[in-house]
């Protein structure tokens, strides 16, 4: 039996639709919103509606943007010879935090996952191939180091093989500060595979 009015239950239900938000967290968020002053609730709602109405995908790379092309694609200081392929726009934010990559990006908006019913035609691989031109010299595959990410990387490498472009995969391995004792066999294998000369 629920103890909240229908409007609160609906708010909880909507928050629970968000990724990684369970019923308890959704309840806390809903109750927090209800305890905010009206002007803060209006600001929150306005920001949500404005973001949904103005943010779109960059027609070049697929990143979130409010201009087209996005700030990264239109930046003349970016290295146009290197394209880093990621699964989601949030992965670009993660890569940019590292401040080690100065090339362009390509967002697949997913991965190949037969178990989820997603094939190569369901993600932005055709668009990646269309971006291969005289300027593109290297494609870095930075898909997630899981079964779907590996399958996606292997498929893209196969598709790009006939083209005159170098295809590399980011190394996977032991995290900094991690202990070998806790690493699984696949992680250790990838760490050995991706080793560099020092």
UniProtKB/Swiss-Prot annotation:
Residue ranges that the Swiss-Prot or TrEMBL entry lists as coiled coil: none
SMART domains to which the protein is assigned, alphabetical: TOPRIM (SM00493)
GO terms, biological process: DNA recombination; DNA repair
Molecular function terms, GO-annotated: DNA binding; zinc ion binding
Span of zinc fingers (C4-type): 58-73
Toprim domain ranges (all copies): 81-175
InterPro entries: DNA_Rcmb_RecR, Rcmb_RecR, Rcmb_RecR_Znf, TOPRIM_dom, TOPRIM_RecR
Stretch forming the signal peptide: none
Known function: May play a role in DNA repair. It seems to be involved in an RecBC-independent recombinational process of DNA repair. It may act with RecF and RecO.
Homology family: Belongs to the RecR family.
Protein name listed in UniProt: Recombination protein RecR
Naturally occurring in which organism (per UniProt): Clostridium botulinum (strain Eklund 17B / Type B)
Lineage of source species: Bacteria, Bacillati, Bacillota, Clostridia, Eubacteriales
């Amino acid at each position: 039996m629920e103890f909240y009015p229908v409007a609160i239950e609906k708010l909880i239900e909507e928050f629970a639709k968000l990724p990684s938000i369970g019923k308890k967290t959704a309840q806390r968020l809903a109750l927090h919103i209800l305890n905010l002053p009206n002007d803060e609730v209006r600001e929150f709602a306005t920001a949500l509606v404005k973001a949904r109405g103005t943010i779109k995908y960059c027609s070049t790379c697929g990143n979130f943007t409010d201009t087209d092309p996005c700030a990264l694609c239109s930046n003349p200081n970016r290295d146009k010879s290197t394209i880093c392929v990621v699964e989601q726009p949030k992965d670009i934010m993660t890569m940019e935090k590292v401040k080690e990559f100065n090339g362009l990006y390509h967002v697949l908006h997913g991965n190949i996952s037969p178990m989820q019913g997603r094939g190569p035609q369901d993600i932005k691989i055709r668009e990646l191939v269309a971006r291969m031109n005289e300027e593109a010299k290297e494609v870095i595959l930075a898909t997630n180091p899981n079964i779907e990410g590996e399958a996606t990387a292997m498929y893209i490498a196969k598709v790009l093989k006939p083209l005159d472009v170098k295809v590399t995969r980011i190394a996977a391995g032991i995290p900094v500060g991690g202990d070998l004792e806790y690493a699984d066999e696949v992680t250790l294998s990838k760490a050995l595979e991706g080793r560099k000369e020092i």
